[in-house]
Amino acid sequence: MASAGNQRFNDEAANWDKNPSVQEATRLAFDSIKPIIQTLAERKQSTTGARLDVLEVGCGTGLLTLRVAPLVREIVAVDPAHGMIQTLEAKINTPTCQEIAADGPRNNSHNVVPVCRLLEDPEDPALPALDGNDPTGRRRKFDLILSHLVMHHVPDLRAFLGTLFGCLVPGGRVALTDFEDFGPEAIKFHPPNKLDGVERHGIPARWMEDLMKEVGFQDVKVSVGWTLAKSVELWEGQKPGDTLGFPFLVCEGARP
């Protein structure tokens, strides 16, 4: 992500969770990916007796992280904005840390590993080691990688997807969510004063499907998971209270 975007997220981290649109987008994302998580978890449990290891790239303040955490063994939560990671760390270090999880409020921070890093290498030493007795050795790989509202900030999506591919175990999957580029109106997802660090105004569905296949993903599926009604009143020609529906894509794929 661009440095201008990182600075924006650093500045907004303390108040990020107070944004109703952010909360609603996260809730809808979790509702859409929860069945994917559960299916993978059941499959791994039945074949190995173990629970899922998950990587979330662009975790922000952990709104999605803390919903996913009760469903998995561990979730490594990565974000390049130190303000966001500091906010997540403050949450999980608070004894009363409570988020709305899969079946209601619970303390679910024990298995969250925050990492402040712009992740560009599957062997980045900031990631947990595969072997705890060899901290400088190969990095752990993951059963599932999540990323929510991140891809429209990424300059080189091919390289980004390649990094995610390299972070998966064989048979591991990605479930990536972001708003769709449905035409000229998609620019209104962000207010005019928050376009710094925005690389594209949504993700074109067919283009994304083709790109994932080119990177090497199999069993690729890119589909609309939900629509978010978002305020667009700050744009020229709009009236106070005006909203627009933004379709969100769920982008799935597996590493062979």
Locate each region found by the language model:
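Class I SAM-dependent methyltransferase SAM/SAH-binding core
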Residues: L52-L130
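A short glycine-rich, Lys/Arg-flanked "PGG" loop and its adjoining helix->strand segment in the class I
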Residues: R158-R173
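C-terminal lobe and adjacent flexible extensions of AdoMet/dcAdoMet transferase-like proteins
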Residues: V250-P256
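C-terminal alpha-helical "lid/dimerization" subdomain adjacent to the S-adenosyl-L-methionine
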Residues: F9, P20-V22, L64-L66, A175-G245, ...
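Local beta-strand N-terminus motif with an aromatic residue
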Residues: R51, K141-F142
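A conserved beta-strand element that flanks and buttresses the S-adenosyl-L-methionine
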Residues: L146
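Short catalytic micro-motifs in class I SAM-dependent methyltransferases
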Residues: L149-H153
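Conserved class I S-adenosyl-L-methionine
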Residues: M1-L52, T87, T94, L118-E123, ...
